[in-house]
UniProtKB/Swiss-Prot annotation:
Name assigned to this protein: Chaperone protein HscA homolog
GO CC annotations on file: cytosol
Family per record: Belongs to the heat shock protein 70 family.
InterPro entries referenced in this protein's UniProt entry, alphabetically: ATPase_NBD, Heat_shock_70_CS, HscA_NBD, HSP70_C_sf, HSP70_peptide-bd_sf, Hsp_70_fam, ISC_FeS_clus_asmbl_HscA
GO biological process terms, semicolon-separated: chaperone cofactor-dependent protein refolding; iron-sulfur cluster assembly; protein refolding
Entries under Gene3D superfamilies matching the protein: 1.20.1270.10, 3.30.420.40, Actin, Chain A, domain 4, Substrate Binding Domain Of DNAk, Chain A, domain 1
Keyword presence, Manganese: no
Source organism per UniProt: Neisseria meningitidis serogroup B (strain ATCC BAA-335 / MC58)
Function: Chaperone involved in the maturation of iron-sulfur cluster-containing proteins. Has a low intrinsic ATPase activity which is markedly stimulated by HscB.
Length: 620
């Protein structure tokens, strides 16, 4: 029998044939697909020469589906069946949207776990809507390239959580795409700029898209792309600038509630006005509503800037934090890469230039740069030969860990750890005879579980009954290249194991995303004090349990005075547990330990005597 051949890792099975792969920027407002041909990355146009595909899907009465510009043109007249900005909804719940549903012209379902949109073709989810966009891009790529795609790299905001990332992969699967990797959008931009310009040094990627904001601090050196720190807000983007203009328009015209058609009409007009103000000093908004009311309003560039300046400043908060996390000063940044169509707004460019004291880089189209980087990555992962070797190191934005006794958060994978990664740590039981252990996986920077985000729980059963602290349970955290987490727990003596893939049914809400890191910094001293107290409580409870168990077995070794002293020591310690500080609890525990020293010695002697009873000198 002939031996099977195995190719070298990374090599194509057919080394002389270019394998077709593509990079997809699945955007809030527009989506693009790009590929590498003749060693150069380029976005693929549609039949009319347009590279951008509006991220809009319309469900028709005849059962058909429109995607892109045709659907966009019907948004004003058929808003309930025309879905845009699905990226803002994917992997989220109604609760995550807070009060902002009133300006979204959709009929939402009552499902609390998954957002549902009622259309004439029935209930549709953001995953299904996104899948239609991906199908269109897949068809465009395969028709242009003349063959089937072996795989794609799809970009996502760096601050997308597990639910949003998994939902994106589900959409790709529905579209019939093989996902080679999910790639953070700022990282994709760095790939495009790094390879095109052969730059080295520290760069900041400022990515303001239609629905999300991301910032990454990257170190680019020859052959190495390393993400030093990330930050951002998954619910801040160009749509929010539109929303501010929309609300101002309602205020100026004394409007409160609009029907879906009028809402969609005005939203499209304020979006057009926003884009006009990039090149003009004034924009005019004219419309006739369904009730016959006429609207004719002008807004100046200065008014628009004043109205939305707080949103621009809001983007600089994660920028400041990311620089701090990376240990980099503004003066050390070699360049600022602008990504996303929303960075075309002049006051955004001005704010970034003022903050860094330099003109941002914009020699690549900000709408295309993410797709270009994804295409380069897809080309490498497909096994196609490249002119030069390079390595991409991505990071996880928040720490991951688990709950230990006393409500403490034990970090297993610290934030800004390079991914993919796997880390393990041994834990033990707290109670004698404990045969099960609940593994509570959390995310965040705070010291107490109550202040972190709960991701998942699972139970390891079948632990052999042993004395407290004797069992050894190894817990392993593993994050794949897409940023998805799996956790396993294994009891070392028996090999009994349990595991879980963390796929939460909801996303982080807006406040949580932006506040988690700031809270960890501002509450650092209080958190450490709370952790110290919690640790002292755990140690004290363990001590009192051990002493009480010993008294049940061997209290006859003590006279009345000794027994009273120990019971008083236990009472004093338990009294400190209610409201005492960490140092007070530890002092009371030390006192109880001292009181029980003689008791421990007597117990040791008794156990030795029992062990020696009936033994000959020779046996000993």
């Amino acid at each position: 029998m002939a031996l099977l051949q195995i190719s070298e890792p990374g090599m194509s099975a057919a080394p002389h044939r270019h394998r077709l792969a593509a990079g997809i920027d699945l955007g809030t407002t527009n989506s693009l697909v790009a590929t590498v041909r003749s060693g150069s990355a380029a976005c693929l146009p549609d039949a009319e020469g347009r590279v951008t595909l509006p991220s809009v899907v319309r469900y028709l009465e005849n059962g058909g589906i429109e995607v892109g510009k045709t659907a966009l043109s019907a948004q004003k007249t058929d808003p309930l069946n025309t879905v845009s900005s699905a990226k803002r909804l994917i992997g989220r719940t109604l609760a995550d949207l807070h009060q902002n549903t009133h300006y979204l012209p959709y009929r939402f379902g009552d499902n609390q776990r998954v957002i549902e949109l009622h259309t004439r073709q029935g209930v549709k989810t953001p995953v299904e809507v996104s899948a239609e966009i991906l199908k269109t891009l897949k068809s465009r790529a395969e028709e242009t390239l003349g063959g089937d795609l072996v795989g794609v790299v799809i970009t996502v905001p760096a601050y997308f959580d597990d639910a949003q990332r998994q939902a994106t992969k589900d959409a790709a699967r529905l579209a019939g795409l093989n996902v080679l990797r999910l790639l953070n959008e700022p990282t994709a931009a760095a790939i495009a700029y790094g390879l095109d310009n052969a730059s080295e040094g520290t760069f900041v990627v400022y990515d303001l898209g239609g629905g999300t904001f991301d910032v990454s601090v990257l170190q680019l050196t020859k052959g190495l792309f390393e993400v030093k720190a990330t930050g951002g807000n998954s619910a801040l983007g160009g749509d929010d600038f539109d929303h501010r203009l929309f609300c101002r328009l309602l205020e100026q015209n004394g409007l409160s509630q609009l029907n879906e058609q009028d809402s969609q009409l005005l939203l499209s007009l304020v979006r057009a006005a926003k884009e006009q103000l990039t090149t003009q000093t004034e924009a005019r908004i004219q419309a006739t509503l369904s009730d016959g009311m006429a609207i004719d309003t002008s807004i100046s560039r200065a008014e628009f800037h004043n109205l939305t300046q707080h949103l621009v400043m809001k983007t600089l908060e994660p920028v400041t934090q990311a620089l701090k996390d990376a240990g980099v000063g503004k003066n050390e940044v070699k360049g600022v890469i602008m990504v996303g169509g929303s960075t075309r707004m002049l006051h955004v460019q001005q704010a970034v230039a003022t903050f860094f004291g330099q003109t941002p880089l914009n020699n690549l189209n900000p709408d295309e740069v993410v797709a270009l980087g994804a295409a380069i990555q897809a080309n490498v992962l497909a096994g196609n030969k490249t002119d030069g070797e390079w390595l991409l190191l991505d990071v996880t934005p928040l720490s991951l860990g688990l709950e230990t006794y006393g409500g403490l958060a034990e970090k297993i994978i610290p934030r800004n750890s390079t991914i993919p990664t796997a880390r393990a740590q041994d834990f033990t039981t707290f109670k004698d005879g404990q045969t099960a252990m609940t593994i509570h996986v959390v995310q965040g920077e705070r010291e107490l579980v109550a202040d972190c985000r709960s991701l998942a729980k699972f139970t390891l059963r079948g632990i052999p009954p042993m004395a407290a602290g004797a069992a050894r349970i190894r817990v392993t955290f593993q994050i794949d290249a897409d940023g998805l987490l799996s956790v396993s727990a294994q009891e070392q003596s028996t090999g009994v194991q349990a595991q879980i893939e963390v796929k939460p049914s909801y996303g982080l809400d807006d406040d949580t995303i932006t506040q988690m890191l700031k809270d960890s910094m501002s509450n650092a001293a209080e958190d450490m004090a709370a952790r110290a107290r919690a640790e002292a409580v755990v140690e004290a409870e363990s001590l009192t349990d051990a002493v009480n168990a010993a008294l049940e077995l061997d209290s006859d070794l003590l006279d009345a005075e000794e027994l009273q002293q120990i019971r008083q020591g236990i009472a004093d310690l338990q009294g400190r547990l209610k409201d005492g500080k960490a140092e007070d609890i530890r002092a009371a525990a030390a006192k109880l330990g001292s009181i029980t020293d003689n008791f421990a010695a007597k117990r040791m002697n008794r156990n030795i005597q029992r062990a020696l009873t009936g033994q000959s000198v020779d046996n000993i």
